[in-house]
């Protein structure tokens, strides 16, 4: 080892190794696929509690609801959604 070396493998040596690409050829596409399925199935909306794109407004409304009372905003929106 050279003086001042931390003992870690150089980055170039890691990315040119067969072992690195065997591992990452499986993990990188599977992470992408898992993320795609998480979003496309709607599970992301359920997990984070956000409304789905078609649930922002009621069918009879054409614009966003306006909240008039700052501290009563949630109750105003709850009344509107009933």
UniProtKB/Swiss-Prot annotation:
InterPro entries in the record: PSII_cyt_b559_asu, PSII_cyt_b559_asu_sf, PSII_cyt_b559_N, PSII_cytb559_asu_lum
GO molecular function, one term: electron transfer activity
Superkingdom, natural source: Bacteria
GO CC terms of this entry: photosystem II; plasma membrane-derived thylakoid membrane
Membrane topology value: Single-pass membrane protein
Transmembrane spans: 22-36
Coiled-coil intervals, chain numbering: none
Cysteines paired by S-S bonds: none
GO BP annotation list: photosynthetic electron transport chain
Principal location: membrane
Assembly with partners or alone: Heterodimer of an alpha subunit and a beta subunit. PSII is composed of 1 copy each of membrane proteins PsbA, PsbB, PsbC, PsbD, PsbE, PsbF, PsbH, PsbI, PsbJ, PsbK, PsbL, PsbM, PsbT, PsbX, PsbY, PsbZ, Psb30/Ycf12, peripheral proteins PsbO, CyanoQ (PsbQ), PsbU, PsbV and a large number of cofactors. It forms dimeric complexes.
PANTHER family, per database record: CYTOCHROME B559 SUBUNIT BETA-RELATED (PTHR33391:SF9)
Function in brief: This b-type cytochrome is tightly associated with the reaction center of photosystem II (PSII). PSII is a light-driven water:plastoquinone oxidoreductase that uses light energy to abstract electrons from H(2)O, generating O(2) and a proton gradient subsequently used for ATP formation. It consists of a core antenna complex that captures photons, and an electron transfer chain that converts photonic excitation into a charge separation.
Stated family: Belongs to the PsbE/PsbF family.
Protein name: Cytochrome b559 subunit alpha
Organism: Synechococcus sp. (strain CC9605)
């Amino acid at each position: 080892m050279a003086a001042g070396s931390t003992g870690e493998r150089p980055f170039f040596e890691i990315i040119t190794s067969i072992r690195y690409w065997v591992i990452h050829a499986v993990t990188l596409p599977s992470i992408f696929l898992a993320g795609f399925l998480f979003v496309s199935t709607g599970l992301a909306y359920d997990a984070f509690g956000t409304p789905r794109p078609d649930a922002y407004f009621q069918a009879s409304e054409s614009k966003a609801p306006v909240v008039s009372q700052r501290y009563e905003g949630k109750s105003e929106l709850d009344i509107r959604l009933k």
